[in-house]
Swiss-Prot record:
Alphabetized Pfam families for the sequence: Dala_Dala_lig_C, Dala_Dala_lig_N
Binding residue positions for Mg(2+) 2: 301, 303
MF GO annotations: ATP binding; D-alanine-D-alanine ligase activity; metal ion binding
InterPro entries found in the cross-reference section: ATP-grasp (IPR011761), ATP_grasp_subdomain_1 (IPR013815), D-Ala_lig_Van_CS (IPR000291), D_ala_D_ala (IPR005905), Dala_Dala_lig_C (IPR011095), Dala_Dala_lig_N (IPR011127), PreATP-grasp_dom_sf (IPR016185)
GO cellular component: cytosol
One GO-annotated biological process of the protein: cell wall organization
UniProt-recorded name of the protein: D-alanine--D-alanine ligase
Catalytic activity annotation: 2 D-alanine + ATP = D-alanyl-D-alanine + ADP + phosphate + H(+)
Family: Belongs to the D-alanine--D-alanine ligase family.
Cofactor requirements of the protein: Mg(2+); Mn(2+)
Keyword Chaperone: no
Purpose of the protein: Cell wall formation.
Domain spans labelled ATP-grasp: 132-334
Length: 348
């Protein structure tokens, strides 16, 4: 039986490109090589597409993918050169120009099946402000927030935020993930500085009420028939779960399943599946919740391309449900092919 070609697209132009490399290396080691032949393509920080390694068997633990530090520009190709009939693309890309609909649109123009959510749901979920407004219309609870858009009166935003929220607040670029550019502010001075920092990553800024809460995550998998995992908890040894804690210091542990009561567990799974459908998602996502000390549940974020590193919550959640990493990849590929056939059918 011939092997299915799986193309890993990784790297990218966003500030989350280092996470993408870690995720892609984890995927390339988890693949079942009796069923797949893996090709990898690196997208550099400046946007070049570089042809990199190919694998017909599991790479060694010392094998590393190309990065911006080891780039070989003589291997640069045209973006459209990744096309291969029958291949499935796994865009292991995080953040802007990766999970915001850009790559998804490019792959649809190439007529290639790809793992993950479609153009619309990717772009909606990428923007935290838009996501909140869509989920509000679906009746899903969220923490109170205000918004600052670059060019607006900053002093007025500060005054409106102080009137609507209480310190501490968290300031986030609307179109970033992996906790990049997020700051905690406990005064007007810190809030101003946090907004200015976030503006270096995005022109749309979300300011959220800080809540004393546990961070609980639910994995989602499927197309029209979506399935959810039991919730898992991010147990932190830090003030908040920032990029440094997630990917460098690794100052977190995972509790799977989370030790929460059954009603909260059920509610989170229902909210997660509702959110997935509300944005028109397909393939996969991870829903991140806050569980307040009073038992109140808030949906914090919908992540359409969660991390796939060896310590990432998403694959661990599915492993607990009885779907190991290799089987998860195989199912994601199947879902990608299913959606591709459906999209193509709609164009006839």
């Amino acid at each position: 039986m011939s092997k299915q070609t799986l193309i890993l697209l990784y790297g990218g132009r966003s500030a989350e490109r280092e996470v993408s490399v870690l995720s892609a290396e984890s995927v390339m080691r988890a693949v079942d090589y009796t069923k797949f032949f893996v090709k990898t393509y690196f997208i550099s920080q400046t946007g070049q597409f570089i042809k990199t390694q190919e694998f017909s068997s599991r790479p060694t633990l010392t094998e590393r993918l190309m990065t911006n530090d080891t780039i070989r520009l003589e291997q640069q190709i045209r973006p459209s050169d990744i096309y291969e009939e029958g291949a499935v693309v796994f865009p292991v890309l995080h953040g802007p120009m990766g999970e915001d609909g850009s790559i998804q649109g490019f792959l649809e123009v190439l007529r290639m099946p790809y793992v993950g959510t479609n153009i619309l749901s990717s772009s909606v979920a990428m923007d935290k402000i838009t996501t909140k407004r869509v989920l509000e219309s679906a009746g899903i609870p969220q923490v109170a927030y205000t918004v600052y858009i670059e060019g607006q009166d900053l002093d007025r935003c500060l005054a409106e935020t102080e009137a609507a929220l209480s310190y501490p607040v968290f300031v986030k670029p609307a179109n970033m993930g992996s906790s990049v550019g997020i700051s905690k502010a406990e005064s007007e001075e810190e809030l101003r500085a946090a907004i200015l920092l976030a503006l270096t990553y995005d022109s749309r800024i979300l300011i959220e009420q800080g809540v004393l809460a546990r961070e609980i995550e639910v994995g989602l998998l499927g197309n029209t028939d979506v399935k959810s995992t039991l919730p898992g908890e991010v147990v932190k040894n830090v003030d908040f779960y920032d990029y440094q804690a997630k990917y460098i210091d690794n100052e977190i542990t995972m509790a799977i399943p989370a030790t929460i009561d059954e009603s909260a567990m059920t509610s989170m799974r229902i909210y997660a599946e509702t959110a997935f459908k509300a944005i028109g998602a397909c393939g996969l996502s991870r829903c991140d919740f806050f569980l307040g000390q009073d038992g109140q549940i808030y949906l914090n974020e919908l992540n359409t391309m969660p991390g796939f590193t060896q310590w990432s919550m998403y694959p661990l959640l599915w492993e607990h449900m009885g779907l190991n990493y290799a089987e998860l990849i195989e199912e994601l590929v199947r879902l990608a092919q299913e959606m591709f056939e459906k999209r193509e059918g709609h164009l006839i």
